[in-house]
């Protein structure tokens, strides 16, 4: 009987999918479940002074990861591109927008070099 209950719980447990967004999905509408995660992967090059700035409603998402991973490159090479990974976990059901801008923080009032917008529907 215990094995049956364990198996039934295992079959009905929630599955958290990870939805990956890149620059290619700019202006896309993403439909996700409440238990899913969003992972945004963007190329960046910190040596240029540019950085991705993210805007999202903090009552709708929590930031669960924000890392920069160097792309493979020859040893000793500097100024090589990296991948920034931002992972968000939904906090509530609804429709919202995530915006990103690639800019230099000291260049106030200047438009970002690149801008991305994702619409997200959380069910």
Curated annotation (Swiss-Prot):
UniProt cross-references to InterPro entries, sorted A to Z: Chagasin-like_sf, Cys_protease_inhibitor_I42, Prot_inh_I42_chagasin
GO molecular function, one term: cysteine-type endopeptidase inhibitor activity
Disruption phenotype: RNAi-mediated knockdown causes an increase in peptidolytic activity.
Domain of life (superkingdom): Eukaryota
Signal peptide, first to last residue: 1-16
Pfam family, one: Inhibitor_I42
Keyword Glycoprotein set for record: no
Compartments it resides in: Cytoplasmic vesicle; Lysosome; Cytoplasmic vesicle, Phagosome
Residue numbers covered by motif BC loop: 45-50
Motif (DE loop): 71-81
Keyword list, A-Z: Cytoplasmic vesicle, Lysosome, Protease inhibitor, Signal, Thiol protease inhibitor
Motif (FG loop) on chain: 105-114
GO CC aspect terms: lysosome; phagocytic vesicle
Function, as annotated: Cysteine protease inhibitor. Inhibits cysteine proteases CP1, CP2 and to a lesser extent CP5.
Entry similarity comment: Belongs to the protease inhibitor I42 family.
This protein's domain notes: The BC, DE and FG loops form a tripartite wedge that blocks the substrate-binding site of target cysteine proteases. The BC loop interacts with the catalytically active cysteine and histidine residues of the protease catalytic center.
Complex formation: Monomer. May form homodimer. Interacts with cysteine protease CP2. Interacts with cysteine protease CP5.
PANTHER family for this protein: AMOEBIASIN-1, INHIBITOR OF CYSTEINE PEPTIDASE
Protein name (database record): Amoebiasin-2
Species of the source: Entamoeba histolytica (strain ATCC 30459 / HM-1:IMSS / ABRM)
Gene: ICP2
């Amino acid at each position: 009987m215990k094995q049956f209950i364990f198996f039934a719980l295992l079959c009905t447990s929630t599955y958290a999918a990870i939805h990956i967004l890149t620059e290619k999905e700019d202006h896309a509408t993403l439909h996700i479940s409440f238990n899913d995660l969003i992972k945004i992967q963007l190329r960046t090059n910190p040596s240029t002074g540019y950085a991705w700035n993210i805007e999202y409603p903090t009552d709708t998402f929590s930031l669960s990861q924000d890392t920069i991973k160097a792309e493979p490159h020859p040893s000793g090479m500097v100024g090589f591109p990296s991948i920034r990974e931002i992972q968000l976990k939904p906090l509530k059901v609804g429709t919202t927008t995530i915006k990103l801008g690639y800019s230099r923080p000291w260049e106030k009032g200047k438009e970002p070099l690149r801008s991305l917008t994702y619409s997200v529907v959380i069910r």
